[in-house]
Amino acid sequence: MDYENILMALKNGNVPESGVKELCIGREKQVNEFEKLLDKVDNKKAIVKFINGEFGAGKSFFLKVIEEMAYDKNFVVSWITLSNDIPFNKIDIVYKNIVKSLKCKTGTSLSHIIDRWITGLKMEAFEETSNPQKQNQLVQEAIYDDLAETREHTSAFAMAIESYNKLMNEEDYKTAEYAKAWLRGDSNIPFTEKRKFGVKGDVTKENAIHFLEALSIFVKSIGYSGLVVLIDEAEFTMNLHTKKLRDVAYNYMRDIYDNCNLGKFENSLFVFAATPELFDNQKKGIPSYEALDDRLKDVLDTDLPDMRKPIFDLKGFEKKDLMDVSGKLLIMHEEAYKWNASDKINPILDDIVGIHVENAGLTGGKVTPRTFIRSFISVLDTVQQNQSYFKDSNEILQVFNDREAELNEEIDEFDDDW
């Protein structure tokens, strides 16, 4: 594992590309719950979850953990972040970006997923016969059979995929690319080209969820465990300018929630991550749209955790969690930079954590991991590169305290929420 890249990403306030599960301290119950959810989704279930956490509590980090688990279990995953360019009231744009962001453990893009599947069918046909015409026929039959359930849901989606294979065999690569572009939601395809691969119309706000349902069925039918869609910074919905636009966005969330419960989606997991304001704000948050709020709100007034609720809270770290994560970071740093930190850092580890907990005292001892992680790695980097300078442990503690003060004064503009 590339510890140096992981440490660099964390120091910069970003979520590492890999290895995050190793650092998912204090979230064991949540991780176990999502392991179970992914197993249920593999068995035809469709589920929607909302993650509620303060900025810096680790929502994006936890989404990355879910992503890694999903890849390990052979899911196709898409991660989108809501923004001005991807507002949830424009569900057709959301669909396009979900498809654009598709990944599996072997590669990226819907094109890769389709081509890899067809290549596998061609290899099977090649093993059965050496006759090229019979091979093509076997592949066409296998494609037709694999798309049976998708075809029942939306014939156009299946038709575009079947036509793509046929057009590739005919070496009409231009139209074949149009067929894949149409599946991705491209609305700039000439009518004459769409007619060649047997479809009409485009992905619109009226049918985008229907296309998303077809996509979930398709990826399962060709051998994947299902579809996982991770939607970060869902609180952006509150920034939509009018109540009408926000209501449209919340209604699409409700549609996805209902369609999962009604069985219209299969083998699908949708995870929305947001700050508490989305769930609490009466004027602009989910409570402002009763139809969604009624489905999500907790009827029990209790602080006891319940992982099976639609919304689960991602709490800040406690001192024990910080001790555990700092211990892991210390080991990673020693391995990455080939030095012995035990003499200078281990004796004051409890003091370092204590400083951070004291600084976060206003939160009742619950702390967000991001500031601590960034400060701690900065100190490790500084001490490792200047070992002869640090004669006194108090000097190290002062560096940590100063770094924390700097980070707390920053206006955080990172896209990733550790």
Question: Model-derived features: where do they sit?
Answer:
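C-terminal alpha-helical "lid" subdomain
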Residues: N165-A181, D301-P305, K315-W418
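Glycine- and acidic
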Residues: P16-E22, N52, I80, K196-K200, ...
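Short amphipathic C-terminal alpha-helix that caps PH/PH-like domains
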Residues: V94-L102, M253, S326-L330, F376
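P-loop NTPase nucleotide-binding core
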Residues: V48-G53, A57, F61-I222, L362, ...
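Short, well-ordered alpha-helical packing segments
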Residues: E35-L38, E67, Y95, V99, ...
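A short, basic N-terminal segment
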Residues: M1-I47, Y389-W418
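Eukaryote-specific, cytoplasm-facing alpha-helical/coiled-coil scaffolding segments in long proteins
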Residues: F61, E124-F126, T237, V399-N408
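The catalytic "switch" region of P-loop NTPases
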Residues: M1-Y3, V31, A176-N346
